[in-house]
């Protein structure tokens, strides 16, 4: 079947090029923190414990980031190979291979981040679930099932705050095994299984590994309470002076002017927001949300709109500059020909087509994919495209709860899931996208028109919260 298909070598080439370009594995301060935990075997939950524990096991073979680099790059390119083999007989299936080399996917594929593990692992699980066919040898089916369970258990706990995305992909996975079961039963099974995944993860983290519990949620609660403090005209956090809150308002941190005020307080040296009492912060936040519900909604929408930005603005963080940040752990990285080439490749696209690194572009693109997939849900019986697109939207939209700057990793899965949702749609679509829109019913045409206008003109109607105006009031 595959004779005369030299393109089958492309995923292998992509794997080798990725390993070479990112060798020994790019590392930011977050990566270095996790590696330090893996070395010392002293874990805390500020970063996913399961990832640090896996790293500590890899260190028994080869110390450093290289084993983790191989792990995450292999998950991605193995997923590409599996999907391509399953869709090789489709017209234009080569599109799948070509788009797998997209700069917005490759640019951070070799950075040792939980976000990359999450995205590569999810894509591999989707690939395994797609068009599932059982092996003739029963033992092989058992091995595949076992590996899939371990994989989904890992990715569910490597980014546990994305539980809605996990729930959707879990449904896709369960559906691939239980196609004859009613939808309601599969939804219930997915929900129970997802809860079980997180339950096992919590038990492993705090009972088996005995990881130290941190208060990362404090950062977002402090941001909320700074906003409410400005509304009230006094500090709602007794440990933080009101004047210090006001002093941090004009600062632009990671291109954000609304979120990340806590970071300004921390770098001042006077405060450590993670040491504040979480329960007290939470109680005060709840009271203020009840008192100022509309103001809180407006603030969150404004901050989310600021995070989304515009699709013509060049993203500030789509490449880990320097490869490996300076450290005392003895890890160094030197650019080679492939590193330099990949950076130039990413830089060129980020300059000429900046929208491919924009959260706004992937938010709206995922909505386009959802609408197209929904129209074809009776044809695509597995609903793979629809589930991928929905997960892409939810992954991006969850940043409304609180996010850093528009760092590409924070919507990496959204970019990957949307891309492969559209690829699968194209492979299964007998007509062009223009034909799909043309033959849509009136409500769908209206939706397309509104979506296009909003996308082109970037009408951000909620982006009007200004801290300085609030102070003047």
For each predicted feature, which ranges?
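Transmembrane signal-anchor helices characteristic of membrane glycosylation enzymes that use polyprenol
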Residues: 3-26, 101, 193-206, 451-463
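Aromatic- and kink-enriched transmembrane "portal" helix at the membrane-lumen/periplasm boundary
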Residues: 20, 49-52, 56, 61-65, ...
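Membrane-interface alpha helices of multi-pass inner-membrane proteins
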Residues: 16, 143-159, 170, 191-198
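Extracytoplasmic catalytic/substrate-binding loops of multi-pass membrane glycan-assembly enzymes
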Residues: 21-35, 42-54, 58, 62-66, ...
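Membrane-interface anchor segments at the N-terminal boundary of transmembrane helices
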Residues: 62-67, 302-393
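Membrane-proximal stem/loop segments at transmembrane-domain junctions that anchor or position
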Residues: 211-334
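Transmembrane-helix motifs of polytopic, lipid-linked glycan transferases
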Residues: 70-90, 120, 124
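Specific aromatic-rich, kink-prone transmembrane helix
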Residues: 39, 82, 118-136, 147-152, ...
């Amino acid at each position: 079947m595959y004779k005369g298909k030299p393109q089958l070598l492309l995923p292998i080439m992509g794997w080798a090029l990725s390993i070479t370009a990112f060798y020994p594995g790019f590392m930011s301060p977050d990566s270095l923190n996790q590696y330090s935990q893996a070395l010392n075997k002293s874990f805390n939950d500020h970063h996913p414990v399961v990832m640090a524990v896996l790293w500590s096991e890899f260190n028994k073979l080869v110390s450093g980031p290289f084993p983790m680099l191989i792990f995450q790059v292999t998950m991605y390119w193995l997923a590409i190979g599996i999907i391509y083999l399953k869709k090789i007989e489709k017209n234009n299936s080569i599109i799948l291979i070509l788009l797998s080399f997209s700069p917005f996917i490759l640019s951070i594929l070799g950075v040792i981040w939980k976000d990359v593990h999450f995205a590569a692992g999810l894509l591999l699980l989707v690939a395994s679930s797609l068009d599932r066919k059982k092996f003739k040898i029963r033992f092989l089916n058992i091995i595949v099932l076992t590996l899939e369970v371990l994989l989904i258990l890992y990715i569910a706990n490597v980014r546990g705050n994305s539980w809605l995305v996990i729930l959707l992909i879990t449904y896709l996975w369960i559906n691939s095994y239980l196609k004859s079961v009613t939808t309601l039963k599969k939804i219930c099974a997915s929900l129970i299984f997802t809860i079980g995944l997180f339950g096992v993860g919590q038990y492993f983290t705090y009972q088996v590994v005995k990881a130290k519990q941190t208060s990362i949620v404090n950062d977002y609660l402090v941001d909320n309470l700074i906003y409410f403090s400005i509304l009230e005209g006094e500090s709602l956090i007794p440990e933080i002076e009101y004047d210090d809150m006001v002093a941090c308002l004009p600062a632009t941190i990671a291109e954000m002017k609304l979120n990340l005020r806590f970071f300004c307080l921390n770098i001042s040296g006077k405060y450590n927001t993670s040491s504040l009492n979480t329960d007290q912060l939470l109680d005060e936040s709840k009271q203020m949300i009840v008192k100022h519900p509309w103001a809180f909604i407006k603030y969150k929408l404004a901050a989310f709109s600021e995070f989304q930005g515009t699709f013509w603005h060049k993203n500030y963080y789509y490449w880990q500059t320097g490869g490996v940040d300076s450290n005392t752990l003895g890890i160094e990285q030197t650019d080679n020909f492939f590193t330099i080439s990949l950076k130039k490749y990413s830089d060129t696209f980020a300059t000429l087509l900046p929208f491919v690194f924009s959260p706004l572009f992937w938010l709206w693109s995922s909505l386009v994919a959802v609408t197209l997939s929904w129209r074809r849900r009776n044809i695509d019986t597995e609903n793979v495209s629809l589930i991928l697109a929905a997960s892409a939207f939810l992954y991006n939209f969850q940043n409304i709860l609180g996010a850093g700057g528009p760092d590409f990793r924070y919507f990496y899965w959204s970019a990957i899931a949307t891309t492969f949702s559209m690829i699968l749609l194209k492979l299964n679509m007998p007509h062009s996208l223009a034909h799909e829109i043309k033959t849509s019913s009136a409500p769908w045409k209206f939706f397309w028109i509104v979506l296009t206008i909003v996308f082109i003109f970037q009408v951000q109607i909620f982006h009007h919260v200004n801290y300085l105006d609030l102070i003047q009031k």
